[in-house]
A protein has these predicted regions:
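Short, aromatic-rich amphipathic segments at membrane interfaces
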Residues: 96-97, 172-177, 599-631
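Soluble non-transmembrane domains of integral membrane proteins
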Residues: 526-618
Length: 667
């Protein structure tokens, strides 16, 4: 750090630390005073919830800005900066390094939680004051827990004094990638966002009323959190594919599982909220799902930060930190389930529905998703529990997860399509058969045509084509049914954003499933030695290796290969895979050369140099792999579109007042 910058920013870290303490003070006020106000019926005390939320968020923004300044100014007197940055690191990686390790990522988590709290306080003013006070108080309690954890065990502003290092130890080379600038914030937006659904559920339990108005207010927040988490998972898969050099996009890594489980439960939650909003049923089940979604988010935090597992995603962390999070997790789960047990008798549903109804299909959807999440939870935690109890080492790998998860997802797609077509409360069987018959016949025909066009009659491929067509055609059939009275042209503009969001999200699932199966079943791969001038053929492509040249990067040295790709005598691409040595950490990284296409990726990675200019080279041809991430982004976009539906913003105040009451409820 230069003398001028150091002089100008001498006390910036101390100001950042003070801002975290002040944010904690506001969080404590937000946790206690409004809740007491709701219990006493004191409007003044309840009204303090919003300014407390704003103050907490403002100080967290300031603290985050102070840490960002420390990175940009190369303030290596700050231990966290010295451990995760370097003067030669490009500025954009210095910025992403702010959340590149445990302490900074936890500050980002607290900031995003403060942001969600601020958003709820601003956009939920139509809520009865007592309900809003309870919601913000619950979120304040969560913020208090994380801020205590941050300040007591994980201070990102701790100094290295008096011996300040001349330079930093650099950011982990795995994290020096554009994908890691956006992947963690998106993931945290989802993780933390489920705290809103949790807070609404607990607040409604405290008031003793869960009905359509509560579900309507919870649902858009839950959908947004779910969409961000899905986008974050998708970006993480894309990053792993091109950055790790293995050519894979999902490894059933424990930390991948830790993010996937709350997404699955969140998917069940948004569908259950839809039933509660529309029909007033599944209230207890919906509350349990809200508790489970946020609890699984906390479990993911524990797995990443406790040191109990080894993963490319995990932070090297003091196990004592894991104990703090585990206690917090047990407090959240135990406290919320105890409250649920006390309040459950007053939130029972008394509305009936028949077997062939949308309620039944959505319940089936919920059960499949919860079973899938439970199966992943068992496979993730069992090795850890076995190790803790017996010391035995066991690895649960892809064969277990694939054998159980794939059939469940196939069943989910079947239920998904039928669920779009059935009616609420009761559906005449004859009418439903009439709706589904053309969908089934069309799906079978499209699957056969697609199989012929694709040139592969592998049963898994044909089944996936049929399931994807089943979902697509069911959606089209439902659109025609919804617009039959006005006609297709006049009827389409009358369909709501929520409806279009649902259709796009379901389409995204179908597209993603096609990408998963086609890329997994039909990928081609070869590992071999190539010297300059030599070539190899794979899946109809010829790869000509022209050698590798050495060059210097800003904080690394690289051997960059050149590989020409030829098909039918015509050059279609030139790929430049790299082998990088990050000099500060003496860490070797592989940067794949990828020619991305709509129907296939050509993927080349350099292995080790073998002498005389020859290299070990890994070549993949991956059909339709991009469809995995395109489908994931479609699903996330569908969720965000659905959350913008006008019905979440109009004619709500009167319904909420009627359902929850303006006063008189006890906390």
């Amino acid at each position: 750090m230069t003398a001028g910058l150091y002089s100008a920013g001498l006390y910036i870290p101390e100001l950042g630390h003070l801002a975290m303490i002040l944010a904690l003070c506001f969080a404590l006020v937000q946790s206690v005073v409004p809740l007491l106000g709701a219990w006493r019926g004191d409007r003044l005390w309840m009204s303090l919830a919003q300014p407390a939320a704003w103050g907490q968020f403002a100080f967290l923004v300031f603290a985050f800005g102070c840490l960002t300044y420390a990175f940009m100014a190369d303030d290596f007197s700050v231990d966290y900066v010295a451990s995760n940055s370097n003067s030669a690191l490009p500025w954009y990686y210095k910025f992403s390094a702010v959340w590149g390790a445990h302490e900074g990522s936890l500050l980002l988590w607290a900031l995003i939680l403060g942001g969600w709290t601020f958003a709820v306080s601003v956009f939920s003013r139509q809520l009865p004051q007592v309900m809003l006070a309870r919601v913000l108080a619950i979120m304040g309690m969560i913020s208090t827990g994380f801020l205590l954890f941050l300040i007591l065990t994980s201070n990102p502003f701790a100094r290295i004094l008096p011996q300040i290092p001349a330079d930093g130890r650099d950011l982990n080379p795995l994290l020096q990638d554009i994908g890691l600038i956006v992947h963690p914030p998106m993931l945290y937006m989802g993780y933390v966002g489920f705290s809103v659904a949790f807070a609404f559920a607990i607040a409604a339990l405290l008031g003793g009323r869960l009905d359509a108005a509560w579900a309507r207010w919870s649902r858009p927040w839950t959908i947004v959190a779910w969409a961000f988490l899905g986008i974050g998972i998708t970006l993480g898969s894309w990053w792993a594919y091109y950055e790790l050099g293995w050519g894979g996009w999902w490894f059933w890594d424990p930390v991948e599982n830790a993010s996937f489980m709350p997404w699955l439960v969140g998917t069940a939650l948004i569908h259950s909220l839809a039933v509660t909003e529309k029909r007033g049923v599944f209230k207890s089940w919906t509350v349990l799902l809200a508790i489970a979604a946020f609890s699984l988010s906390l479990l993911g935090t524990f797995l990443v930060r406790s040191g109990v597992l080894t993963s490319v995603h995990a932070f090297a962390s003091d196990p004592e930190r894991g104990v703090f999070i585990l206690i917090f997790l047990l407090f959240v789960v135990g406290g919320s389930l105890t409250l649920f047990a006390l309040r459950a008798p007053v939130v029972k549903s008394h509305v009936g529905f028949n077997l062939w109804s949308r309620e039944t299909l959505l319940l089936g959807n919920n059960l499949v998703l919860v079973v899938a999440a439970s199966m992943i939870l068992l496979g993730t935690l069992y090795p850890l529990i076995l190790d803790a109890m017996t010391g035995a080492k066991l690895s649960v790998g892809p064969p277990y997860f694939n054998a159980l998860f794939i059939p469940l997802m196939a069943l989910l797609m079947v239920v998904m399509a039928v669920g779009m077509l059935v009616r609420w409360k009761d559906t005449p069987v004859k009418w439903l058969v009439g709706m589904l018959t053309p969908v089934l016949l069309g799906s079978a025909a499209l699957a056969v045509i697609a199989g012929i066009a694709y040139g592969d009659f592998n049963w898994a491929v044909i089944a996936t084509f049929m399931l994807a067509a089943w979902v697509l055609l069911a959606g089209v059939r439902d659109i025609f049914d919804k617009t039959r009275h006005k006609g297709l042209i006049k009827g389409l503009p009358t369909l709501t954003r929520s409806y279009w969001g649902m259709q796009i999200a379901h389409l995204g699932i179908a597209v993603c499933a096609l990408g998963v199966v086609l890329s997994s079943q039909n990928s081609a791969e070869r590992d071999l030695r190539l010297a300059p001038g030599e070539s190899m053929s794979l899946a109809g492509y010829q790869f000509v290796f022209e050698g590798a040249k050495h060059f210097e990067g800003p904080n690394f040295t690289s051997d960059k290969g050149t590989i020409r790709v030829i098909r039918n005598g015509k050059e279609i691409s030139v790929l430049h895979p790299e082998k990088r040595l990050y000099t500060v950490q003496n860490s070797v990284m592989t940067e794949a050369g990828i020619d991305a296409g709509f129907t296939r990726d050509l993927y080349v990675a350099l292995g080790e140099p073998l002498g005389d200019g020859a290299w070990a080279v890994r070549v993949h041809v991956k059909p339709f792999v991009r469809w995995i991430w395109f489908g994931g982004l479609l699903t996330g976009f569908g969720g965000l579109l659905a959350a913008l539906d006008r019905r979440y913003r109009v004619k709500v105040k009167s319904r909420v007042r009627e359902a929850l009451g303006m006063s008189g409820a006890t906390a």
